[in-house]
């Protein structure tokens, strides 16, 4: 989640991931990701979607908005209508099981994780995410779902492009401890 220019999707593909589903809502970054995936001949291992993740709905994004990372999802008055999917919808759509989830979506992690069902979260053996506005609710939700969670303490970051420019950023690593029988 938060494919940006495709570098992480390419990394996981080169590290023998079965298949990578990469979501990037910004058309500008999405187009660069397409080029990078083609340059690495990974079109058959990476499904790149010009969609976002979080709370289900739509946003409008200017197609020429040059977001190359570090900004939250903006809703423009004019532009391309971009679909936003919940984690439950994504898990069901791609029939995900025993997957890994990487989340770096500049704030969408809260809607994505806090509103996900236990069933959707249990589709993932490992979750690594960057958080932007605190970790406590995310850690609590993952622990309630049966994950063993480690996290880095937040560091202050000022991002003038973000809706809330004063952020406390860090990483969360979660490992699923729930036994799945399927």
Residue ranges and their predicted role:
Residues 1-182:
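Phosphate/nucleotide-binding beta-alpha loop and adjacent structural elements of enzyme active sites
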């Amino acid at each position: 989640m938060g494919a940006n220019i495709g570098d992480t999707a390419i990394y996981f593909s080169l590290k023998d991931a079965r298949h990578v589903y990469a979501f990037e809502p910004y058309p500008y970054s999405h187009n660069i990701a397409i080029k990078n995936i083609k340059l690495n001949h990974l079109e058959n291992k990476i499904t790149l979607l010009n969609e976002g993740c979080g709370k289900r709905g739509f946003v409008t994004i200017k197609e020429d908005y040059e977001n190359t990372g570090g900004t939250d999802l903006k809703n423009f008055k004019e532009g391309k209508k971009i679909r936003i999917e919940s984690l439950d919808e994504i898990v069901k759509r791609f029939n995900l099981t025993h997957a890994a989830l990487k989340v770096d979506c500049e704030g969408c992690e809260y809607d994505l994780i806090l509103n996900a069902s236990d069933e959707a979260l249990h589709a993932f053996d490992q979750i690594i995410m960057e958080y932007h506005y605190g970790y406590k609710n995310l850690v609590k939700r993952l622990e309630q779902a049966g994950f063993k969670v480690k996290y880095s303490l937040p560091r202050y970051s000022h991002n003038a492009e973000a809706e809330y420019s004063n952020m406390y950023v860090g990483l969360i690593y979660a490992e699923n401890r729930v036994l799945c029988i399927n």
